């Protein structure tokens, strides 16, 4: 087999470029990518169903001046976050042309020559940039993916070798898209406050208003033996809220519901929104962050962009006061967000292990 092109990671390790690997004629899948020996639930062949699907929430209905319409949609949102932890958001008001442009620009980025993409590679001690995060050792199993991760807000924390160096018009398109995602996340947080009937005025939105926003572009190449690999290891998101846009209609995202995996069929131009660990902590377990994973296709690539919306670094994170009562005692510890973030970044992706660490 030809020698694969290597990508240098921020921790000094190097891994093969799976996008370049996928272009080769592979007699067998390299052992570092195979999922043999995984727990039965994490095996690719574990029970997967297409019979159920995540709820669909209509933002126009949520914001409707008609009280009955708004209340019905708000109840649907509450149920979706409580029972599923995921929903698809439609009629969200984000311009269709902007969505088309961001899809085209991201595809263009991943199609750049490798020497162009590695200009944005991870630097020593950093997870941001082009590569693959959460790799801790030479013998760790690898996901069948390549990503470009970047902290986008607040502006003063942007890395000078990443966002400012992106080529035009990609940089301008991405800037516009991320701005829209920030505004959209604020609206969703406001609706979640309303659905929880919080006593605290802006008890949730104040924490996230000037908080961190991280972007992650995902590329999942085709794999000749998709049943042997994972595009993304099963995990729950650390964030408060995640908003994901699929760039094509290739399925691959699956969420865990009890002992089954449910495939999400992305609706055209809908956003897939999910509750993160921080939001589960803040709601004292009312809203649930849910394990999810990505599987890959034998012939088609899959691309997506996710934005993760978090609190300010100096914020104290813990269950919201009015959601802690003698009947519903605090389920999670409190902590400074920056310290909690460092703890999370020191871990590899592993189900809901971070939330287990935060439990009382």
Curated annotation (Swiss-Prot):
Quickly give the catalysed reaction: codeine + 2-oxoglutarate + O2 = morphine + formaldehyde + succinate + CO2; thebaine + 2-oxoglutarate + O2 = oripavine + formaldehyde + succinate + CO2; (S)-scoulerine + 2-oxoglutarate + O2 = (S)-3-O-demethylscoulerine + formaldehyde + succinate + CO2; thebaine + 2-oxoglutarate + O2 = neopinone + formaldehyde + succinate + CO2
Activity modulation: Moderate substrate inhibition. Not inhibited in vitro by acylcyclohexanediones.
Q: Tell me the gene name.
A: CODM
Q: In which tissues is it expressed?
A: Mainly expressed in stems, capsules and leaves and, to a lower extent, in roots.
Q: Which Pfam families does this UniProt record tie to the protein?
A: 2OG-FeII_Oxy (PF03171), DIOX_N (PF14226)
User: What residues does the Fe2OG dioxygenase domain cover?
Assistant: 211-311
Record the organism.
Papaver somniferum (Opium poppy)
InterPro entries reported for this sequence: DIOX_N (IPR026992), IPNS-like_FE2OG_OXY (IPR044861), IPNS-like_sf (IPR027443), Oxoglu/Fe-dep_dioxygenase_dom (IPR005123), Plant_2OG-oxidoreductases (IPR050295)
EC number(s) per entry: 1.14.11.32, 1.14.11.31
Keywords, in A-Z order: Alkaloid metabolism, Dioxygenase, Iron, Metal-binding, Methyltransferase, Oxidoreductase, Transferase
What is stated as this protein's family in its record?
Answer: Belongs to the iron/ascorbate-dependent oxidoreductase family.
Q: Which GO terms describe its biological process?
A: methylation; morphine biosynthetic process
Q: Which cofactor does it need?
A: L-ascorbate; Fe cation
What is the protein's name according to its record? Codeine O-demethylase
> Function, please?
Non-heme dioxygenase involved in biosynthesis of morphinan-type benzylisoquinoline and opiate alkaloids natural products. Mediates the conversion of codeine to morphine. Also catalyzes, with lower efficiency, the 3-O-demethylation of thebaine to oripavine and of (S)-scoulerine to 3-O-demethylscoulerine. Supports, with a lower turnover, the conversion of codeinone to morphinone, of thebaine to neopinone, and of neopine to neomorphine.
Task: Give the residues the record marks as binding 2-oxoglutarate.
Answer: 220, 302, 304
GO terms for MF: codeine O-demethylase activity; metal ion binding; methyltransferase activity; thebaine 6-O-demethylase activity
Hey, which pathway is this one from? Alkaloid biosynthesis; morphine biosynthesis
């Amino acid at each position: 087999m030809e020698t694969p092109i290597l990508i240098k990671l921020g921790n000094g390790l190097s891994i093969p470029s799976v996008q370049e690997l996928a272009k080769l004629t592979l007699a067998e899948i390299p052992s570092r990518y195979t999922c043999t020996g995984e727990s039965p639930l994490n095996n690719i062949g574990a029970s997967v169903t297409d019979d159920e699907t995540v709820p669909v929430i209509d933002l126009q209905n949520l914001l409707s001046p008609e009280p009955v319409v708004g209340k019905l949609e708000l109840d649907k949102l509450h149920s979706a976050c409580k029972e599923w932890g995921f929903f698809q958001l439609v009629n969200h008001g984000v311009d269709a042309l902007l969505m088309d442009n961001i899809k085209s620009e991201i595809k263009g980025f991943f199609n750049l020559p490798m020497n162009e993409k590695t200009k944005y590679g991870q630097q020593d001690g950093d997870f941001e940039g082009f590569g693959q995060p959460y790799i801790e050792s030479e013998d760790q199993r690898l996901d069948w993916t390549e990503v470009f991760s970047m902290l986008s807000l607040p502006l003063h924390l942007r890395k000078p070798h990443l966002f400012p160096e992106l080529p035009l018009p990609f940089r301008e398109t991405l800037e516009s898209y991320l701005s829209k995602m920030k505004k959209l996340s604020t609206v969703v947080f406001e609706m979640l406050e309303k659905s929880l009937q919080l006593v605290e005025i802006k008890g949730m939105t104040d924490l996230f208003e000037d908080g961190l926003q991280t972007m992650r572009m995902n590329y999942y190449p085709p794999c000749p033996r998709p049943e042997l690999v994972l595009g993304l290891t099963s995990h729950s998101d650390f964030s408060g809220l995640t908003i994901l846009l699929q760039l094509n209609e290739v399925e691959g995202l699956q969420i865990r519901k009890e002992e089954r995996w449910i495939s999400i069929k992305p609706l055209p131009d809908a956003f897939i929104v999910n509750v993160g660990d921080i939001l589960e902590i803040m709601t004292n377990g009312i809203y649930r962050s849910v394990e999810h994973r990505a599987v890959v296709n034998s012939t088609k690539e899959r691309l997506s962009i996710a934005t993760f919306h978090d609190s300010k670094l100096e914020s104290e994170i813990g269950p919201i006061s009015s959601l802690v009562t003698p009947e519903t005692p605090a389920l999670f510890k409190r902590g400074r967000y920056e310290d909690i973030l460092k703890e999370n970044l020191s871990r590899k992706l592993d189900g809901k292990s971070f939330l287990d660490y935060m439990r009382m």
